[in-house]
Regions:
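Conserved glycine-rich cofactor-binding loop
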Residues: 10-11
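Conserved NAD(P)H cofactor-binding loop of Rossmann-fold oxidoreductase domains
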Residues: 78-83
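Substrate-binding pocket helix/loop in short-chain dehydrogenase/reductase
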Residues: 86-87, 94-99
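Active-site helix of classical SDR
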Residues: 110, 146
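Residue(s) in the substrate-gating loop at a strand-loop-helix junction
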Residues: 130
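Active-site-adjacent segment of SDR/Rossmann-fold oxidoreductases
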Residues: 135, 156-166
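C-terminal helical subdomain
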Residues: 164, 170, 188-230
Length: 236
């Protein structure tokens, strides 16, 4: 049985991937701040409460997780949030907190998991990036900074870990219909062609696991067929 660690497992893309894995017999260790939103009645689901923005606590957290779950051979790095406004409207603390969760936490978690996978001689790491990591847009300065950072990190880690049998795949979706937009002033328009569904991404990740070890998929870019937005209120 494969075993996966998923950060951001309680909602959105992470939740969909967890459900897909569990439905296909893959054990899931889920990292999230609030598991009340997703608590499947599955003996193979292990919820671990963690605030991944507290980056100094992550090394000890990962040490504990891997000690208790040495069978982990899949990691989905998906935790994060969005905040979109002009750069000058962010405080220094907001910038630090944003980059800590959306970039630094991914790097620290991957540092622990890649060492574990190298010792096993195999493993799959999926990093959830964004189309904002491919092209920068206004009011997405911090989000693009984090996602461009993840893209470069994934490329370098792939070259570093590949010879040890560890595959690294970066997934860059466009707008996905998830609770990500709950706190934002905009969201994809209701027409189904304006957003990717989480199940689409979960299927791609699961199907990748079925490919032979010698097949590497460096990066996957996904876009909705159209990109109309609905604004909930007037943007400032």
């Amino acid at each position: 049985m494969k075993a996966a660690l998923i950060s951001g497992s309680s909602s959105g893309i992470g939740k969909a991937i967890a459900e897909k894995f569990l439905g296909n017999g893959i054990k899931v260790v889920g990292l999230a701040r609030d598991h009340s939103k997703f608590m499947p009645n599955e003996k193979h689901y292990i919820p671990i409460e963690a605030d991944l923005s507290k980056v100094k606590k992550l090394p000890e957290l990962m040490k504990s997780i891997l000690k208790e779950n040495p069978d982990i051979d899949v990691f989905v790095s998906g935790a994060g949030y969005g905040e979109f406004k002009s750069l000058e409207n962010f405080s220094s603390l907001q910038i630090e907190n944003f980059i800590d969760l959306n970039l630094v936490s991914h790097i620290i978690l991957c540092r622990a998991i890649v060492a574990h996978m190298k010792s096993q001689g195999n493993g799959d790491i999926f990093i959830l990036g964004s189309e904002a990591g491919v092209i920068g847009k206004k009011k997405a300065t911090l989000y693009s900074a984090a996602k461009f950072g993840l893209r470069g990190f994934a490329q370098a880690l792939r070259n570093e870990a590949g010879p040890a049998g560890v595959r690294v795949c970066l997934i860059n979706p466009g707008m996905v219909r998830t609770p990500f937009f709950d706190t934002l002033e905009f969201e994809p328009d209701a027409l189904e062609t304006n957003a990717i569904e989480t199940e689409d991404i979960a299927k791609i990740v699961f199907d990748f696991l079925g490919t032979r070890q010698g097949t590497i998929i460096d990066e996957i870019n996904l876009s909705p067929a159209s990109k109309s937005l609905r604004f909930k209120k007037t943007s400032k």
